[in-house]
UniProtKB/Swiss-Prot annotation:
Its EC number is 1.1.5.4. Pathway: Carbohydrate metabolism; tricarboxylic acid cycle; oxaloacetate from (S)-malate (quinone route): step 1/1. InterPro entries: FAD/NAD-bd_sf (IPR036188), MQO (IPR006231). GO terms for molecular function: 2-hydroxyglutarate dehydrogenase activity; L-malate dehydrogenase (quinone) activity. GO terms for biological process: tricarboxylic acid cycle. Its cofactor is FAD. Belongs to the MQO family. It catalyses: (S)-malate + a quinone = a quinol + oxaloacetate. This is Probable malate:quinone oxidoreductase. It is an enzyme of class 1 (oxidoreductase). Pfam families: Mqo (PF06039). The keyword Thylakoid does not apply. Keywords: FAD, Flavoprotein, Oxidoreductase, Tricarboxylic acid cycle.
Length: 501
């Protein structure tokens, strides 16, 4: 039996961007609450939030073609893009508040302005992109988005991508200045430094082995100190499971009925990073292409300017891979041990329904360096093999569950909150847009888990996030105000110049 510790108001499991965001929100709204964080690794932001384990895209649906779909009548549905864009503005507003309050330091350490572009080839794809641009540019959220199918204009926008290119089919791109590159690792670390100053106890190298409900309605966690091997029991009124790929196992251990019937499918990612600074300097944008037929949404190829440790870099990917691990630092048994009697049929159904995904992953795993270079050359025709290295990114666990629309064993490509009916425990599952919408998602957790308190907190939340509870698309005056204030605070001036014009 472990050594029993005191009772806390809140326990956060996992020191990633989600726990960092929730902890920071709670400390602004309920500074008197006692909060403790448990993290298995030795530092914050070391798994999916780490800057090398994600693409660093501020997902605002400016360039990601999988967030806009062509309907049967040929029109473009931008509903999902609108939703994600508004959610990213929530993050920008909160970060701006934290900078203005002195909680976050120099914003360029974690966010930089960077044009976002969509790039396609082939007659049908160009027609789709043109229609998408017409639909989006008419919306206030996407004002300022440009379209061109002129190779000369493209050579101005992306010289590296056009150099040496044989243009033997239609080619086009959209470009919008208001994109961002976000270093979620740096942001996470800064937020945890702040929480430490606010007397939040952060226990690194502490692994949560079990979660159970006690007779008095608390949640008791069995926590092992990985340095000493000792086990402690910690209790809290509210528990947030923000452990990335580790969340599903912990949700299952909690025993809440809402966690039944959910499975996870792990997908790993590889990127290619350019080691020639002269090549890196020739590109300044995040350029997203179109997923190949049969490929999953998270496989959309993109060529990204990144800023890591204040150094400009150039990455291309992702190439998908498969590992049964649910975390980069996880166990090879993760997938197997996540299969339970209550989710086995759901997982099997997903396997049958997603043979194309399975085949795609097998093909990706077997790619040689030269085959990866061929894919890169679709973006950078002059790419030389010795100037690009392969880096292994993080693991993502896609949610599998039964849905009304998709039926049994449907793969959910997105971010999902699962919470107990009484709001005493919540878990975050899934992947993209993930970190970009962290503030919106954590407010959703708070609305579901602290509904009465949210009424008291509403005025303070509105102070931090002026658009809270409103649609920016429907309130253009507020949108302009938010664009101007976030650009000013986050050093993104010029960032919204075209929208504000």
């Amino acid at each position: 039996m472990g050594n029993k510790q005191g009772k806390m108001d809140v326990i956060l499991i996992g020191a990633g961007i989600m726990s960092a965001t929730l902890g920071t929100l709670l400390k602004e709204l309920a500074p008197e609450w006692d909060i403790v964080v448990f993290e298995r690794l030795e530092e914050a932001g070391a798994e999916s939030s780490n800057e090398w384990n994600n693409a660093g895209t501020g997902h605002a649906a400016l360039c990601e073609l999988n967030y806009t779909v062509e309907k049967a009548d040929g029109s473009i549905d931008i509903g999902k893009a609108i939703k994600i864009n508004e959610q990213f503005y929530v993050s920008l507003q909160f970060w701006a508040y934290l900078v203005n309050s002195g909680i976050l330091r120099d914003p360029k350490d974690f966010v930089r302005p960077l044009p976002h572009m969509s790039f396609v080839q082939g007659e049908d794809n160009v027609a789709f992109l043109k229609k998408r641009h017409e639909t989006m540019a008419a919306n206030p959220l996407f004002k300022g988005m440009e379209f061109t199918d002129d190779p000369k204009k493209l050579a101005e926008w992306v010289p590296l991508m056009m150099e040496g290119r044989v243009v033997d089919e239609p080619i086009a791109a959209t470009r919008i200045e208001s994109g961002t590159d976000v270093n979620f690792g740096a942001l996470t670390r800064q937020l945890f430094e702040h929480l430490k100053r606010k007397n939040v106890e952060i226990r690194y190298r502490h692994h949560v082995e079990d979660i159970k409900r006690t007779s008095d309605g608390l949640w008791e966690l069995k926590v092992r100190n990985l340095d000493t091997g000792t086990v402690e029991l910690h209790a809290a009124k509210f528990v947030f499971i923000g452990a990335g790929g580790g969340s599903l196992h912990l949700l299952q251990k909690s025993g809440i009925p809402e966690g039944k019937g959910i499975g996870g499918f792990p997908v790993s990612g590889l990127f290619m990073v350019c080691n020639n600074p002269e090549v890196v300097e020739q590109h300044h944008a995040k350029v997203y292409g179109k997923a190949k037929v049969g490929a999953p949404p998270m496989s959309v190829p993109h060529l990204d300017t990144r800023f890591i440790d204040n150094q400009k870099m150039l990455l291309f990917g992702p190439f998908a891979g498969f590992s049964p691990k649910f975390l980069k630092n996880g166990s090879m048994l993760d997938l197997f041990t996540s299969i339970k009697p209550h989710n086995v049929l759901t997982i099997l159904a997903a396997g049958v329904k997603n043979m194309s995904l399975t085949n795609y992953l097998i093909q990706q795993v077997l790619l040689s360096k030269e085959q990866r270079m061929q894919e890169l050359r679709e973006f950078v025709p002059t790419a030389k093999s010795d100037e690009w290295d392969i880096v292994v990114a993080g693991q993502r666990v896609q949610v599998i569950k039964d849905t009304e629309s998709g039926g049994k064993g449907t793969l959910q490509f997105g971010t999902e909150v699962v919470h107990a009916a009484d709001g005493s425990i919540a878990a975050l599952l899934g992947a993209s847009p993930g970190a970009s919408t962290a503030v919106h998602v954590m407010l959703e957790v708070m609305e579901k888990c602290f509904p009465e308190r949210m009424n008291e907190w509403r005025a303070k939340v509105k102070e931090m996030i002026p658009s809270y509870g409103e649609s920016l698309m429907k309130n253009e005056a507020l949108l302009r105000q938010v664009q101007a204030s976030t650009a000013e605070a986050l050093g993104l001036n010029g960032h919204f110049a075209m929208q504000l014009a």
